[in-house]
């Protein structure tokens, strides 16, 4: 089967935003205008087509990123048909993992901001993630019909809070209740969308007289931004002082793809104005799969390989989301980077070294689906029938193996114990949790060996609430949930030298392992991928006093003991262990003996090295009305918070930034609501581990050891 749409006409984009900036409504309008959903779904009444899990419709927030394919030829039918794959991403802070996961497989992004609340903490997080993956993006300032809407103030915030090179490509005509449409600064025309047919048709009109000067000014800035794309355009601009429409678009495209500038459009998705022009901009300024850097990966021989976006290359794809579907079982969403895959083909998952056969393939549209026979480079689709694939795994051609880089998932910071309400549900709960953990790598399940309880861990209280909620709805398992537990860690404060000796020589084959270790605290560094390095092992053995083959066993023994902790059973972070001496026995020494010697030495040494308990510190930002500021700050101080600063926030509010221990943040949402009559909002993300004060450490240790 030949390709229907050439790969140059593909756009794989994500729509990302802060909670409530109107992202799902924006996506809905995109689906409406591209002719897929004939009735516009409103989030206000819980009917949006992208939000397909029940809880999303109830809470009015988007949790799972659904992938949707649609086609667009332009507002004026001015383009050949383009294929746009959209990934809707959640904006709530507990789900940043979903956003990270989607950005990894996108080529471009549309960031939706609210015209009245502007750049919010979550936007900054999304922006940082998009920078990390070098995703070219444009911004849609939505809700221009809202009270307090101010387009230029949002553009200014983008420059100050996101350090973005923001260039307006439109200006709003009117604002709040009088919002009428936008001026296209490239064409220098007022776009007036018709109210009768929900904005499907429009007319180009002259710019309102009172806006001409302002439009000229911003048109000038736009042309300058385009001219800086290359020398040819610059020279023409310097000679003639103007560029043609095609040249402006060409220049803006080059600079957007290079991440030099970020174009800003505006409108109101709810009022059916502006989204149509954003679709045009996606096609004109965001990249096709062939215009982003080809993806690299590790080949079988550990060297680096490259896969270009082409059907001729060997097949490679990345699984970026797993979803459980009541009818077909597991759906594995993949982004195809290269090659072609037909229904029934075999693929290999090099991460787990397993072969898989692709049963069926479907193209998703929100929650409806159509069966397809093949996928090609650039496609985003869901595969059915894969048995052992987790988020972030690679699927590739068995004859040309490649492992595309793994996605990095943050460590969970909060845990709760769960138990089924009836004994009969125990097994069902295990199955449900297993499925949910396969879908979401930032959610973990383990059984506490001592108490036998099932412990679930995640990125925040809302995250775990939704997991428990989904067990009840999708798997019909009701649970009792225990008190939240904090993921503490341990560390050493002093350097020590210590001996570990494991000897059993009482007849028969004995055991003999003997090591001298130096343990030192080390500051946690980041490696090239931005992952934390929390442990280093250095081998300084000379003259073979400990034979080479036993050295990895010593390292392993130390690491196993580090996982078990020495104070209260929490893993130890930030240790440099140097093996510098020891001895062995020709007959009785074994890997096992040296592993035990290493772990004994670590335990003894860590207890002598002035160990400390570390607690997770959260970066908290509270946006509050000024009159509640005193209460908010006082409350954060009571929670052992360290106030880092206060600044103006949009809409006359104040932003308070603080570092607060996670253990003090439980139930914060409820307390904040009552202090500020529900007018404040907060966001929280993990920042670092820091030493816990003695009184807290003693309390935690007493509780742990009492068990």
Curated annotation (Swiss-Prot):
SUPFAM superfamilies: EF-G C-terminal domain-like, P-loop containing nucleoside triphosphate hydrolases, Ribosomal protein S5 domain 2-like, Translation proteins. The gene is fusA. Keywords: Cytoplasm, Elongation factor, GTP-binding, Nucleotide-binding, Protein biosynthesis. SMART domains: EFG_C, EFG_IV. It comes from the Bacteria. The keyword Nucleotide-binding applies. It comes from Idiomarina loihiensis (strain ATCC BAA-735 / DSM 15497 / L2-TR). Catalyzes the GTP-dependent ribosomal translocation step during translation elongation. During this step, the ribosome changes from the pre-translocational (PRE) to the post-translocational (POST) state as the newly formed A-site-bound peptidyl-tRNA and P-site-bound deacylated tRNA move to the P and E sites, respectively. Catalyzes the coordinated movement of the two tRNA molecules, the mRNA and conformational changes in the ribosome. Belongs to the TRAFAC class translation factor GTPase superfamily. Classic translation factor GTPase family. EF-G/EF-2 subfamily. GO terms for cellular component: cytoplasm. This is Elongation factor G. Pfam families: EFG_C, EFG_III, EFG_IV, GTP_EFTU, GTP_EFTU_D2. Its main location: cytoplasm.
């Amino acid at each position: 089967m030949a390709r229907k749409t050439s790969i140059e006409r593909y756009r794989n984009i994500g729509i990302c935003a802060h909670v409530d900036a109107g992202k799902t409504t924006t996506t809905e309008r995109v689906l409406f205008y591209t002719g897929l959903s004939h009735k516009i779904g409103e989030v206000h009444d819980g009917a949006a087509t992208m939000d397909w899990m029940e809880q999303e419709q109830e809470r009015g927030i988007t949790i799972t990123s659904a992938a949707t394919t649609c086609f667009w030829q332009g507002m004026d039918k001015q383009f050949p048909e383009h294929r746009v794959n959209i990934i809707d991403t959640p904006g709530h802070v507990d789900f940043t993992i979903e956003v990270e996961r989607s950005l990894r497989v996108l080529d471009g992004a549309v960031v939706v901001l609210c015209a009245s609340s502007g750049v919010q903490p979550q936007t900054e997080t999304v922006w940082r993630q998009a920078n990390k993956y070098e995703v070219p993006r444009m911004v849609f300032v939505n809700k221009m019909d809202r009270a307090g809407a101010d387009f230029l103030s949002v553009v200014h915030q983008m420059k100050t809070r996101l350090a973005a090179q923001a260039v307006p490509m439109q200006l709003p005509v009117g604002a709040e209740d009088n919002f009428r449409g936008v001026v296209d600064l490239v064409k220098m025309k007022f776009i007036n969308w018709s109210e009768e047919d929900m904005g499907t048709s429009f007319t180009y009109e002259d710019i309102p007289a009172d806006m001409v000067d302002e439009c000229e000014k911003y048109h000038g800035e736009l042309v300058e931004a385009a001219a800086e794309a290359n020398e040819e355009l610059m020279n023409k601009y310097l000679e003639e002082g103007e560029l043609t429409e095609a040249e402006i678009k060409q220049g803006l495209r080059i600079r957007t793809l290079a991440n030099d500038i970020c174009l800003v459009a505006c409108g109101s998705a709810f009022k059916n104005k502006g989204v149509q022009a954003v679709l045009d901009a996606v096609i004109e300024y965001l990249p096709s799969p062939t215009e982003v850097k080809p993806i690299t990966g590790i080949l079988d021989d550990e060297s680096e390989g490259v896969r270009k976006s082409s059907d001729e290359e060997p097949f490679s794809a990345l699984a970026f989301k797993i979803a459980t579907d009541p009818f077909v079982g597991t759906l594995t969403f993949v982004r195809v980077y290269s090659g072609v895959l037909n229904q029934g083909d075999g693929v290999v998952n090099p991460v787990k070294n397993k072969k898989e056969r692709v049963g069926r393939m479907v193209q998703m549209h929100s929650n409806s689906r159509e069966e397809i026979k093949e996928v090609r480079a650039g496609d985003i689709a869901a595969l059915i029938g894969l048995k052992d694939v987790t988020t972030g795994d690679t699927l590739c051609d068995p004859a040309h193996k490649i492992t595309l880089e793994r996605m990095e998932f943050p460590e969970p910071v909060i845990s709760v114990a769960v138990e089924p309400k009836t004994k009969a549900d125990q097994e069902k709960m295990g199955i449900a949790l297993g499925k949910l953990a396969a879908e979401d790598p930032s959610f973990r399940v383990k059984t506490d060996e001592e108490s036998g309880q099932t412990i679930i861990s995640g990125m925040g209280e809302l995250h775990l609430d939704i997991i428990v909620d989904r067990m009840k709805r999708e798997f019909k398992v009701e649970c009792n949930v225990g008190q939240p537990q904090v993921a503490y860690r341990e560390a050493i404060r002093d350097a020590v030298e210590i001996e570990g000796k494991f000897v059993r020589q009482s007849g028969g084959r004995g055991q003999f392992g003997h090591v001298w270790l130096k343990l030192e605290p080390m500051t946690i560094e980041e490696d090239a991928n931005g992952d934390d390095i929390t442990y280093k092992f250095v081998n300084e053995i000379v003259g073979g006093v400990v034979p080479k083959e036993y050295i990895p066993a010593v390292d392993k023994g130390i690491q196993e003991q580090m996982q078990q902790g020495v104070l209260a059973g929490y893993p130890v972070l930030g240790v440099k262990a140097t093996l510098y001496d020891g001895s062995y026995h020709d007959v009785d020494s074994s890997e096992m003996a040296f592993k035990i010697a290493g772990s004994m030495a670590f335990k003894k040494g860590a207890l002598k090295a002035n160990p400390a308990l570390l607690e997770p510190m959260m970066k908290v930002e509270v946006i509050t009305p000024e009159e509640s500021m005193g209460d908010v700050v006082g409350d954060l101080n009571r929670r052992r918070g360290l106030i880092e600063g206060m600044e103006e926030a949009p809409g006359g509010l104040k932003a308070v930034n603080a570092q607060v221990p996670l253990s003090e943040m439980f139930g914060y949402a409820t307390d904040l609501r009552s202090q500020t009559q529900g007018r404040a909002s907060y966001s929280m993300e993990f920042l670092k581990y820091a030493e816990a004060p003695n009184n807290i450490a003693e309390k935690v240790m007493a509780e742990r050891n009492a068990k």
